[in-house]
Amino acid sequence: MQSLARLSRTSLVQKGLVPQTIKNYSSVSQAEIDNEPRFLECFKTFFDKAAGLTNLKPGVLNNMKECNVALRVEFPIKNEHGDVDIIAGYRAQHSHHRLPCKGGIRFSEEVDLQEVMALASLMTYKCAVVDVPFGGAKGGVRIDPKKYTVAQREKITRAYTLLLCQKNFIGPGVDVPAPDMGTGEQEMAWIRDTYQAFNTNDVDSMACVTGKPISSGGIRGRTEATGLGVFYGIREFLSYEEVLKKTGLTPGIKGKSIVIQGFGNVGYFAAKFFEQAGAKVIAVAEHNGAVYNADGLNIDALNKYKLQHGTFIDFPGATNIVDSVKALEIPCDILIPAALEKQIHIGNVADIQAKLIGEAANGPMTPRADQILLNRGHVIIPDLLLNAGGVTVSYFEWLKNLSHVRFGRLNKKWEESSKKLLLEFVESTVNKKLSEAERSLIIHGADEIDIVRSGLEDTMQNACAETRKTANEKNTDYRSAALYNAIMKIKAVYESSGNVFS
């Protein structure tokens, strides 16, 4: 089995993976890399750049930029050794211009207050970009979930939820969490159950959290929503003439080479949808290794291998990349960072070879790296636009919970009956009968997942078109254009509410 351990520039050139003409940034010191701003400051830098395109007063912009309120809590949990761990939890609500606030909860040892404030800020503008009527929020619990048993994770989740209830930081009309890194359907079900236990008279209590299992009031299509939104967004941008001209790519997904960093919920489903559309996913990276195959990886086989072995290393037919971050530097048509923030920075930006970068993760690029790539002519589809599929479908789930009926239940059969009558009329008119398979395809009424995916596709297309229009009108990059649109939408809410801004 080949190994590209550390993937030095020399070895990359020798293997033909990196052109020799790319400028060498090996002189960048570790101190300079470490000196890049923290996540919250990165977001504020991007915000300030977009704010410069507006004519709003500094005080108005500062109010929009700063986080409204943040909560830090601590609570004890007995571990498997009988000792007591003190667990830190956080929840930040960036903006109350619309309620409820919305944002995920992550379980990670890296969670701190500035991170959740940054993510909450990003959520406000992400919601505005895709016209989801929420303010931004984010939460986290500072643990490594792999170090705790299922029973202990349940205790931690319920204790954290109880504190959110006590502080009025959760509720269908107040603040609605969702899954994030280290959490999933099960944690959301525990949150829903805990909230309902303390709010027995709230008929809409099911809407206190999204990303739940179907049996607990979830919605079909939520699990893959972010990855599918990434697919829809990149597909849309690959139909824009100016993007094709700048990147030298051809229209559509088929035949494109793709590198994905991160193989969690977002990365896996993004990879699946691109593979189904005819793209070649040539490399996939996780924290403990990456694999590369120029002819494309089999995503289902790769996922099965990872579940069995806990790593991609030694996946049959692929080349190992031990230092997984180096996978970002492999030449490809499309690079999709779908892992953590600040993965593309001053230390590795010179080696990024992708023509188009789609930010499936939150904040995967620092401002300096962003500007360098823009100057070099790369196309960057920003996180607040591209990974908004999750919050879009969370919005649909919230609406479902408030209406107390699944999408499609009231109209599916009526649609099928109407289509059947129309089809029979057409068949009798043209004197031709369709096959049963053709009839079933045409007559089929929309199920919940059909409605969800249709709504997500329409949302992503509209948001991409709005971003493109502003970028062309303002002669700016897509991140600044998306943020500009969000800022102006939030300003309109404040003005129509009779706020002092007006």
UniProtKB/Swiss-Prot annotation:
Gene Ontology BP terms: glutamate catabolic process
Cellular compartments per GO CC: extracellular matrix; mitochondrial matrix; mitochondrion; phagocytic vesicle
GO molecular function, a single term: glutamate dehydrogenase (NADP+) activity
Compartment annotation: Mitochondrion matrix
Regulation: Subject to allosteric regulation. Activated by AMP and ADP.
Active site per the UniProt annotation: K138
Binding site residues for substrate: K102, K126, S394
PROSITE patterns with a match to the protein in the record: GLFV_DEHYDROGENASE
Chief subcellular location: mitochondrion
Catalyzed chemical reaction(s): L-glutamate + NAD(+) + H2O = 2-oxoglutarate + NH4(+) + NADH + H(+); L-glutamate + NADP(+) + H2O = 2-oxoglutarate + NH4(+) + NADPH + H(+)
Ligand binding (NAD(+)): H96, H97, R98, D131
Keywords, sorted A to Z: ATP-binding, Mitochondrion, NAD, Nucleotide-binding, Oxidoreductase, Transit peptide
Major enzyme class: oxidoreductase
Signal peptide span: none
SMART domains, sorted: ELFV_dehydrog
Keyword Transit peptide: yes
Protein's UniProt keywords contain Secreted: no
EC number(s) recorded for this UniProt protein: 1.4.1.3
UniProt xrefs under InterPro entries: Aminoacid_DH-like_N_sf, Glu/Leu/Phe/Val/Trp_DH, Glu/Leu/Phe/Val/Trp_DH_C, Glu/Leu/Phe/Val/Trp_DH_dimer, Glu/Leu/Phe/Val_DH_AS, Glu_DH, NAD(P)-bd_dom_sf, NAD_bind_Glu_DH
pH-activity dependence text: Optimum pH is 7.25 to 7.5.
PANTHER family linked to this entry: GLUTAMATE DEHYDROGENASE, GLUTAMATE DEHYDROGENASE 1, MITOCHONDRIAL
General remark: ADP can occupy the NADH binding site and activate the enzyme.
Family stated for the protein in its record: Belongs to the Glu/Leu/Phe/Val dehydrogenases family.
Subunit organization: Homohexamer.
Protein name: Glutamate dehydrogenase, mitochondrial
Lineage, uppermost ranks: Eukaryota, Amoebozoa, Evosea, Eumycetozoa, Dictyostelia
